[in-house]
Design a protein with these regions (language model features):
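Glycine-rich flexible loops
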Residues: 1-128
Length: 128
């Protein structure tokens, strides 16, 4: 169960994707367990709860969240179809993972998404 490598969106987080069996966030044990999970990847599916992304920068975490949400949308649509999606070649998955790691290593990673989000907020007249 979980996301399958069936779209470019999921490939952008595939090598950075982890799953966490969600518990009550009010306990120190759950917080510690989530911290351990995040050591395995910055794009986290909290089973039966939602999504969490972390990273070195807020813009980077925002971009991960955007791509992870899109990957989930594609997965839900694909599961609603009566046939399996065509698989993505394992070499393409590997190459895309290498490219995604290079992009995430750039200090400007996610900045375009961050600036776009700020423009949307400011366009609505929202005051900080």
């Amino acid at each position: 169960k979980g996301l399958r490598p069936i779209s470019q969106d999921v490939l952008s987080v595939w090598d950075d994707l982890v799953y966490h069996e969600y518990g009550m966030p009010t306990s120190q044990e759950e917080c510690d367990a989530l911290g351990v999970t995040c050591q395995g990847g910055n794009s986290v599916v909290l089973r039966n709860h939602g999504l969490l992304t972390v990273g070195a920068t807020i813009p980077g975490a925002l971009r991960r969240m955007y791509m992870l949400e899109r990957a989930c949308e594609v997965e839900v649509i694909a599961r609603g179809m009566n046939e399996e999606p065509d698989p993505i070649d394992p070499d393409v998955i590997r190459q895309y993972g290498e490219r995604a790691r290079q992009q995430r290593a750039n200090p400007e990673y996610g900045m375009t998404y961050w600036k776009a989000a700020l423009r949307q907020i400011e366009g609505k007249g929202t005051d900080w």
